[in-house]
Amino acid sequence: MSARWPAFIAAPLALSVPAAHATVYLSLEQAQQSLFAGASFTPVDFGRRERVWRASQGGWFIVDQVLGKHELITYALGIDPQGRARGIEILEYRESHGGEVRHTSWRAQFSGKGAADPLQLDHDIRNISGATLSCRHITDGVKRLLKLYESELRQR
């Protein structure tokens, strides 16, 4: 038996569903050029979920996703030939709050960090009030990608 919702109930329910909030800040190509200006990129497939490119100038460009509070955050990490972060870029942010992780001053904290650096929120990386989970998960993601470089990419 098929249930029918009267219009006076169905319409308000449909209107009360929150719209997904997604902001695309940079395309893949824009993020690549932001972190490695003038470089060309060669994709590297090594069977993992992260998308990885070797930069013609030396170094690596990796795109990854982490969970914010409820939604995925797509970010990119540039790693120099010595295994240190050149910087991070936020490509797409889907949360309704906490978009401050895109601010240059927050992202700049990662520059120069390597796999041996602690990268702990509230110690090495400043937290943003109202964006704690986004900050924590991006920080953990960057640390994971720096470890990935050490274990998988450095010898390539």
Language model region names:
Residues M1-R4:
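Positively charged n-region of N-terminal signal peptides that target proteins for export
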Residues A7-S16:
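Bacterial N-terminal signal peptides
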Residues A19-R126, T132-R136, D140-R156:
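Flexible, solvent-exposed loop/hinge segments and secondary-structure transition points
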